[in-house]
Amino acid sequence: NNLLGKRTKENGYLQADAYLGGKVVKEYGGGICQVSSALYYCALLSELQIDERENHTFRVGYMPLSYDATVSWGGPDLKITNDRAYPIRIEASMADKELKVSIVGTDNGKYVKLSYTSGYAYMNPEYPDVATGILSEATRWVYDSTTDALRSCSDFPSAAFPESAQMDAAMCPTKQMPTDFNMIII
């Protein structure tokens, strides 16, 4: 948030759709979460430390479940730390309404695959068969580039439903190891 500044007309932001109070509204800087989500996704792939991240209240159309990151002035923020022994460079560009974000650094002898699981939340006792939300969890699988041995596995949970509901791991299907990887371009 501090890097991008307050999203106002005076700071050069245009109005676009944004989520506010459970509704879609026009807001200066609306759509900025596409940038934070792309950066979050790249940080996951780069095995960077995720210090702070919140998903949207609603499912977004530009990223798979668990890979979005909402930001709002005075509210949720995305904070990542370069916990590597070397510097990184974040590159971002926009062409033909396509956002491209990359994190460039030194090869550390590892590669990353991402996967996610998802399931529906059934939280209303009056209507036990009606889904009231979506639970999902991204998993970062880190492998050794030389041996293909699994080095680590980290989970990043998400939930898109009323705040009163709590995430319950029993509601999500069993996590599966990824078999392939697809690049996401926003």
Language-model region placement:
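Well-ordered beta-sheet/strand-loop patches within structured domains
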Residues: 1-186
